Amino acid sequence: TELSGAPLDLYQYRGQVLLIPQFTGLLYQKSQQEGDVVDGLPSHQFHQY
């Protein structure tokens, strides 16, 4: 569901990588060990071309 409580159709994100907030900490720990970087950025703040 969306923050508003409305149903969210995940099909609209087909082909994209999604990071589920509940798993962020686990992913960060795993990726840090592998030398990767996980960063959280606001979705539209940097949407400039």
Curated annotation (Swiss-Prot):
The keyword 4Fe-4S does not apply. Its EC number is 1.11.1.9. It catalyses: 2 glutathione + H2O2 = glutathione disulfide + 2 H2O. One of its GO terms (molecular function) is glutathione peroxidase activity. Optimum pH is 6. Inhibited by Cu(2+), SDS and DTT. Activity is slightly increased by Fe(2+), Mn(2+), triton X-100 and EDTA. The keyword Protease does not apply. Optimum temperature is 40 degrees Celsius. Keywords: Oxidoreductase. Belongs to the glutathione peroxidase family. Glutathione peroxidase which may protect the cell from oxidative damage. This is Glutathione peroxidase. It comes from Lactiplantibacillus plantarum (Lactobacillus plantarum).
